[in-house]
């Protein structure tokens, strides 16, 4: 492990951020700290994770949602101080790591099948 990787690992440990397990296809609610003038508030951004890039401290993910009939995508840094918390609403069952094809789909075609828990027995 080189020096930069070691420093990144120490920084991640210092941040002590609670990050749930999530993958592309999952529907998540990202609580973002928004500062307006002197006031600060939390804004919830709910959508489908279409990509995740794991690069240590520089990890990020893209969340896509439909707002007023228009597709909106937002990229979040995983360890950013503006990202307050990430909550997984539902697990999606997909076979791709990057779901960029959802950009061209609308309505029912853009739905993602829900991943059901494994049956025991």
Curated annotation (Swiss-Prot):
Additional remark text: Present in outer membrane vesicle formulations which are used as vaccines in human.
NCBIfam families: rplS_bact (TIGR01024)
Pfam families named in the record: Ribosomal_L19
Reported function: This protein is located at the 30S-50S ribosomal subunit interface and may play a role in the structure and function of the aminoacyl-tRNA binding site.
GO-annotated molecular function: structural constituent of ribosome
Protein name as catalogued: Large ribosomal subunit protein bL19
Family indicated by similarity: Belongs to the bacterial ribosomal protein bL19 family.
SUPFAM superfamilies: Translation proteins SH3-like domain (SSF50104)
Origin superkingdom: Bacteria
Keywords tagged on the record: Ribonucleoprotein, Ribosomal protein
Cellular component terms (Gene Ontology): cytosolic large ribosomal subunit
Gene Ontology biological process: translation
């Amino acid at each position: 492990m080189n020096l930069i990787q070691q420093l990144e690992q120490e920084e991640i440990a210092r941040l002590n951020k609670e990050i749930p397990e999530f993958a592309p296809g999952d529907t998540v609610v990202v609580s973002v700290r928004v500062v307006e003038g002197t006031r600060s508030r939390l804004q919830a951004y709910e959508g489908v994770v279409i990509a995740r890039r794991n690069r240590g401290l520089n990890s990020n993910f893209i969340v896509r949602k439909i707002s007023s009939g228009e597709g909106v995508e937002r990229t979040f840094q995983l360890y950013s101080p503006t990202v307050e918390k990430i909550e997984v609403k539902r697990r999606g069952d997909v076979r791709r790591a990057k779901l960029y094809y959802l950009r061209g789909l609308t309505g029912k075609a853009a739905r993602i099948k829900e991943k059901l828990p494994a049956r025991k027995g």
